[in-house]
Amino acid sequence: YYNDFSMNKRSKVDGVVNFFRPLVAKGLPIDAIGMQGHMIYGDTDYVKEYTYSIKAIASIGLKSQFTELDLTMLPNPFGFSGANVSDNISYKDAMDPYKDGLPKEKQEQFDQFWLDFFQMLMDNKENVIRATFWCLNDANSWRNDFPIKGRTDYATLFDRQCKPKPAIQKLIDMVKDQEKKALKENKPNKNK
């Protein structure tokens, strides 16, 4: 098993796939390739990029795992990327605009992002074996202090009181709807 960051970037995933291709061909016991998912809302088209990554990894006969999933809705200071927790940028109010909660529009964007992301996972379920989150709730998320100490972030699917955010019920409903549709499509027609 191998797990790495920035696996949504085509050049990175291509490099990883090219590294593992001969090892897989030699029969090395590799179960999966993991992709850390510390995402920044609006930064890039993660669904499109990760779809490519899943397919690239599957092309060498391996499954994908998504690890460390979270999504910051806060502004990205100066195009900052990476997850070196020793990095720290000076606090500025403009970089912490949602101290009192996410505005409704931002919450809806957050929800839609996760609906789209999980739809991608479901569309690629034959090649994805796991998706896990980095933290259970917003109160304990590392995003509150990274890369700017003291910010208030909303990066998980559970709020600061461990209550599910609206995205949870929307995801449950999406899965139920797809299960119903699949059952209906697979139901034998008695009129034939």
Predicted regions and their residues:
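Short, flexible active-site loops
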Residues: 34-39, 98-102
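Acidic-and-aromatic substrate-binding clefts and catalytic sites of carbohydrate-active enzymes
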Residues: 5-15, 38-48, 71-77, 139
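Short aromatic-glycine motifs in intrinsically disordered, low-complexity regions
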Residues: 17-26, 115, 120-122
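Aromatic-lined carbohydrate-recognition surfaces of secreted/lumenal glycan-active proteins
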Residues: 1-13, 65-69, 130-136
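Extracytoplasmic, non-cytosolic globular domains
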Residues: 12, 20-31, 35, 55
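Conserved active-site beta-strand-loop modules that form the wall/rim of enzyme catalytic pockets
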Residues: 31, 62-66
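Short, electropositive alpha-helical surface patch
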Residues: 10-23, 144-156
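Aromatic-rich peripheral "rim/lid" segments of glycoside hydrolase catalytic domains that contact
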Residues: 48-63, 71-192
